[in-house]
Amino acid sequence: MVCGSPGGMLLLRAGLLALAALCLLRVPGARAAACEPVRIPLCKSLPWNMTKMPNHLHHSTQANAILAIEQFEGLLGTHCSPDLLFFLCAMYAPICTIDFQHEPIKPCKSVCERARQGCEPILIKYRHSWPENLACEELPVYDRGVCISPEAIVTADGADFPMDSSNGNCRGASSERCKCKPIRATQKTYFRNNYNYVIRAKVKEIKTKCHDVTAVVEVKEILKSSLVNIPRDTVNLYTSSGCLCPPLNVNEEYIIMGYEDEERSRLLLVEGSIAEKWKDRLGKKVKRWDMKLRHLGLSKSDSSNSDSTQSQKSGRNSNPRQARN
């Protein structure tokens, strides 16, 4: 038998991978788990219908994977990245083919990075971070190993991801798919969203690079800032997605309210941000709102300190009989 013979070992060492794979399939105990139909509801719309367990996150069954992937439903609902669902399914329900049955195929590093860039700002906003078990650093690069990306999959109906006209090698969400939910600048919204920065700025340029849109603006006035330094100069507002929401027009002047990425010292223009045409009246309103917000914050702090002091005092005299004695 070729597999067990010295000649077979020599052939294996010589790099005849096809023969080696055949040998492994025939050796008892070396057989890998077979492909199985995708049963994870979130992943049934993806362009592959066969997967294999355990997956890249070491879930032994799809039932376990379903419970784990459900935690991302809320993040998927924000549409923070067109690559997020593809990336998650490539990790939780990896594609399985006859040619690659021994080890699930990993998603490409670039897919992970695009998903993280688009969605990490949303996670940061709610005091979370990108999950460590979904780290991009260890994933293969497209031209150095076997991996999958949306660009590499063409369905019977053609490519699911249209070509980006600004980069022939990049495919992403088309601008026609971007539906921005308008948010008006009101005191209620300002209090609820608690923005990290508010600036008056003129839009100089909108840069589109693959799955990222960046707005280049000239800062005219800083109405509010937090930890990230904002110069009275040209700065970038990072959307970290293929959509510019809220929309901006070049050469127009806006009042912009958004969030920041402290770790990267970036100003973010993401879901929940506001951009309205600049009006002096609106600028004055926002300054008043911010003063109220600061006052409310101080009042709450003073109130809690007062309550704490009062409770300590009342604690010492909690028993009237003891006090009289």
Curated annotation (Swiss-Prot):
Residues 315-325 have a biased composition (Polar residues). Its main location: secreted. Disulfide bonds join C35-C96, C43-C89, C80-C119, C108-C147, C112-C136. GO terms for biological process: canonical Wnt signaling pathway; cochlea morphogenesis; convergent extension involved in organogenesis; epithelial cell development; hepatocyte differentiation; negative regulation of canonical Wnt signaling pathway; negative regulation of cartilage development; negative regulation of cell development. Residues 297-325 are annotated as: Disordered. Transmembrane segments: none annotated. Glycans are attached at N49. Residues 178-298 form the NTR domain. GO terms for cellular component: cytoplasm; extracellular space; membrane. Residues 299-314 have a biased composition (Low complexity). It is linked to Osteoarthritis 1: A degenerative disease of the joints characterized by degradation of the hyaline articular cartilage and remodeling of the subchondral bone with sclerosis. Clinical symptoms include pain and joint stiffness often leading to significant disability and joint replacement. Soluble frizzled-related proteins (sFRPS) function as modulators of Wnt signaling through direct interaction with Wnts. They have a role in regulating cell growth and differentiation in specific cell types. SFRP3/FRZB appears to be involved in limb skeletogenesis. Antagonist of Wnt8 signaling. Regulates chondrocyte maturation and long bone development. This is Secreted frizzled-related protein 3. The gene is FRZB.
